[in-house]
């Protein structure tokens, strides 16, 4: 007769129950009807929303773009080669999110925030949505702190404040990325975290930017998010949102961040590809009708926070490529309308050897002057006005055989001022040296020199001031003002250097 032991049976059942690790979940699933070019048309799942993540049975994740009565169109975030007709797909009920932490500093990641630099995994402290609401009006405060770029052509005349959105716009090969790259090393010691987002570029230029950051010691406070032209269009579309999420992580921890989007026009091309393949209705230049909503979302999250959220800030600097200087094209105007100003780089100035090729007349900064220090305000106004008015006499002088004296003087002053704004790369200037150089041009101290003598002399003049006449810098640096004593000493120093420079030329 079988001997039944109830206590032993109970212990076996309890042990097996404790080891049971299967979970029961309710998911809305669907079936792939058609797949190709990274686009899947799915029958079901019920209730899927636009922007929701969907997952195939092999683990490939995609984003639902179209939600129609009987099917949904989704774009794959991978190569999509393993997805076949008849495959099962489930709705996750989530939107895209990434891991974030301080460990991302000094690293290179892709749109899903996975490392791509071969230095191992990145320890994450928390997840963050790639698309989150921008700070509200109550959470913001007016821009009042300067974001120094170290460029004499921008800081005095087109100033940028922390929390501002300043566009860098220009034709191909005019130095847009160079301006952004030069700004990053200048943030050393300023408690600023930099986020560089490369969108749809070739792999070699993106790698060169990262290498430049490493050479200048800027990578220790920089995060690079790179999605080159090879990955799927979905990754290029998501890259700016990943960068914005990383910048927000630091901003809400009372840090100041600078995020560079290079460049949103490539994101628009990727979004156009994503939209045309699922047969969404095309609009102007074949872009979908909601492309004006595409570009404002990442820059709008830039802000200067008020005291309650911690007074952190995110400064956004998108770069956009124009064709033949056409700033009124569709994508450039979309991005321009979302920013607080623009730094316009001219192809004509670039071809003439002016670096950086900033066109002061077209460039503007709407909220930046409120963040400018007093010393820079005191000296910059006159120089900006002269450079903005210089284009007209310069153009007329090319056709006039004998221009009048006033036109000749104005043209000569403009040429000298332009020479003073030339700056080699990389050579960021501290504020006090920018003030001295700008004041020298605005006050006419360089008028006694021939234009040929002005070429190369600004760097020598700054070196002379630092070595022999440090008093003006010692006044400007702590007080942020340009006093009469500083002006007097600076005038004497420039006069001495000009005389010695002219003497050397004669010898």
Curated annotation (Swiss-Prot):
UniProt biased composition (Basic and acidic residues): 282-303
Q: Which CDD domains match?
A: ATP-synt_F1_alpha_C, ATP-synt_F1_alpha_N, F1-ATPase_alpha_CD
Q: Where is this site: Required for activity?
A: 363
EC main class here is translocase
Recorded GO cellular component terms are: chloroplast thylakoid membrane; proton-transporting ATP synthase complex
Documented EC number(s): 7.1.2.2
Residue ranges, annotated region (Disordered): 278-325, 392-430, 452-471
UniProt-listed InterPro entries: ATP_synth_asu-like_sf, ATP_synth_asu_C, ATP_synth_asu_C_sf, ATP_synth_F1_a_nt-bd_dom, ATP_synth_F1_asu, ATPase_F1/V1/A1_a/bsu_N, ATPase_F1/V1/A1_a/bsu_N_sf, ATPase_F1/V1/A1_a/bsu_nucl-bd
Does the keyword GTP-binding belong to this entry? no
Polar residues bias (residue ranges): 305-322
Q: Which family does it belong to?
A: Belongs to the ATPase alpha/beta chains family.
What's this chain's function?
Produces ATP from ADP in the presence of a proton gradient across the membrane. The alpha chain is a regulatory subunit.
UniProt protein name: ATP synthase subunit alpha, chloroplastic
Q: Which organism does this record belong to? A: Selaginella uncinata
């Amino acid at each position: 007769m079988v001997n039944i032991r109830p206590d032993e049976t109970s212990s076996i059942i309890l042990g097996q129950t404790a080891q049971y690790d299967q979970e029961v979940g309710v998911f809305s699933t669907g079936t792939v009807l058609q797949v190709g070019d990274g686009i899947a048309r799915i029958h079901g799942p019920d209730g899927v929303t636009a922007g929701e993540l969907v997952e195939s049975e092999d683990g490939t994740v995609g984003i639902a773009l179209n939600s129609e009565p009987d099917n949904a169109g989704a774009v794959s975030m991978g190569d999509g080669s393993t997805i076949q007709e008849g495959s099962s797909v489930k709705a996750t009920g989530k939107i895209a999110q990434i891991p974030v932490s301080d460990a991302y500093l000094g690293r290179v990641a892709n749109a899903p925030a996975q490392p791509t630099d071969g230095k191992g995994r990145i320890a994450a402290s928390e997840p963050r949505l790639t698309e989150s609401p921008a700070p509200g009006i109550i959470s913001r405060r007016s821009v009042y702190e300067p974001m120094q770029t170290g460029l004499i052509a921008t800081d005095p005349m087109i100033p940028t404040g922390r929390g501002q959105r300043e566009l860098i716009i220009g034709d191909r090969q005019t130095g847009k990325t160079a301006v952004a790259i030069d700004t990053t090393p200048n943030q050393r010691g300023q408690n600023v975290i930099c986020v560089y987002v490369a969108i749809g570029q070739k792999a070699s230029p993106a790698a060169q930017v990262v290498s430049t950051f490493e050479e200048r010691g800027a990578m220790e406070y920089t995060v690079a998010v790179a999605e080159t032209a090879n990955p799927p269009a979905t990754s290029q579309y998501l890259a700016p949102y990943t960068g914005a999420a990383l910048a927000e992580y630091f901003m809400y921890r009372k840090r100041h961040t600078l995020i560079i989007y290079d460049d949103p026009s490539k994101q628009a091309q990727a979004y156009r590809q994503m939209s045309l393949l699922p047969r969404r209705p095309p609009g102007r230049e074949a872009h979908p009708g909601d492309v004006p909503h595409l570009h404002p979302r990442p820059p709008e999250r830039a802000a200067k926070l008020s005291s309650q959220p911690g007074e952190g800030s995110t400064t956004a600097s998108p770069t956009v490529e124009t064709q033949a200087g056409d700033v009124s094209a569709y994508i450039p105007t979309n991005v321009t309308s979302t920013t607080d100003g623009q730094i316009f780089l001219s192809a004509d100035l670039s071809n003439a050897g002016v670096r950086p090729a900033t066109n002061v007349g077209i460039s503007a900064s709407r909220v930046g002057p409120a963040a400018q220090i007093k010393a820079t305000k005191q000296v910059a106004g006159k120089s900006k006005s002269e450079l903005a008015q210089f284009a007209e006499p310069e153009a007329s002088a090319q056709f006039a055989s004998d221009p009048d004296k006033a036109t000749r003087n104005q043209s000569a002053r403009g040429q000298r001022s332009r020479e003073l704004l030339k700056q080699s790369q990389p050579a960021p200037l501290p504020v006090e040296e920018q003030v001295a150089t700008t004041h020298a041009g605005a006050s006419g101290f360089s008028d006694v020199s021939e234009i040929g003598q002005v070429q190369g002399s600004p760097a020598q003049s700054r070196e002379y001031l630092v070595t022999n006449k440090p008093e003006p810098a010692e006044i400007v640096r702590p007080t942020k003002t340009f006093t009469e004593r500083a002006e007097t000493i600076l005038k004497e120093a420039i006069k001495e250097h000009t005389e010695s420079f002219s003497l050397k030329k004669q010898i």
